[in-house]
A protein has these predicted regions:
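Divalent-metal-activated hydrolytic enzyme cores
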Residues: 184-234
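Histidine/lysine/aspartate-rich catalytic loop segments that bind and position anionic ligands
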Residues: 103-157, 161
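Amphipathic, charged-and-aliphatic alpha-helical interface segments
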Residues: 31-55, 72-88
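Long, charged amphipathic helices and adjacent flexible linkers at domain junctions
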Residues: 86-102
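Charged, compositionally biased N-terminal leader segments and the immediate start
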Residues: 1-41
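Histidine-centered catalytic micro-motifs
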Residues: 161-172, 196, 202-203
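Charged helix-capping and loop-helix junction motifs
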Residues: 146-148, 177-184
């Protein structure tokens, strides 16, 4: 009997929320109502904010009472869809010949990511992007790169220039000593293939910085050694 009484109440509530959105848009809803409207779930008190819900893993979401595997996966996929949309919306004829253009192009790649990811933006000699190569992905502050696979993938692109880009999920958008070493190793790896690394962009949330602009991009002529290992940790 209790279940039978609850259903109409919830259905009427959902109908009222749908009417509000139809007439006044999503902005008419409170933050917790956005999630409730989307999946008819409990308010996001467990995570503290809408953004944290969107960034949570399916396993974390399922710790909330009433959230099953399908709902958890759907919430998780929404962030993926958002990132996919942002990446696809970028200008197709972009020229990454300025720091501002490079950052604008690169930032969507890291939207909502909680793990550290390293990309190599492969370009022609006019700085037109050819391909966004995901070189490595790992836990925050640590990635491992298969250098042989990386070199094979890069050579297939016919690129002549490139920009490195990675995110700091838990830290500021500032280059560390490890970031500089990573940059140098990749420069050494790609130099024999005729590919020049023009910059390394670091993204942290809404912030980003250029190692080249900060004078932190390594001078490969001062470190001519070649990276021979099949894989390396950064």
């Amino acid at each position: 009997m209790a279940d039978g009484k609850e259903r109409p109440i919830h259905e009427n509530h959902r109908a009222r929320m749908q009417e509000r959105v139809a007439h006044n848009g999503m902005e008419s809803l409170a933050e917790h109502e956005v999630l409730e409207y989307m999946l008819y779930l409990a308010i996001p008190r467990h995570f503290g904010s809408f953004c944290r819900v969107m960034e949570a893993t399916p396993q974390e979401l399922m710790q909330v009472k009433g959230v099953g595997p399908r709902s958890a996966q759907l919430i998780s996929d929404i962030m993926e869809f958002g990132r996919y949309y942002a990446v696809k919306k970028r200008k197709k004829q972009a020229t990454l010949d300025t720091t501002a253009n490079a950052i604008e192009y690169i930032k969507p790649l890291f939207l909502g990511l909680q793990n550290e990811v390293l990309y190599i933006i492969l370009m022609d000699d006019s700085c037109h992007p050819l391909y966004d190569l995901k070189a490595a992905e790992g836990v925050p502050n640590h990635v491992s790169i298969d250098t042989r696979k990386l070199l094979r993938d890069v050579l297939r692109s016919n690129a002549s220039t490139a920009i490195l880009a990675h995110n700091h999920p838990t830290g500021p958008a500032l280059p560390s000593a490890t970031d500089q070493l990573t940059t140098l190793k990749i420069m050494q790896l790609l130099a024999p293939a005729g590919i020049s690394i023009l910059d390394h962009i670091i993204v942290a949330g809404e912030n980003a910085c250029s190692m080249a602009d900060r004078g932190r991009l390594p001078d490969i002529s001062a470190h001519p050694g070649i990276l021979n290992a099949a894989s390396t940790d950064f």
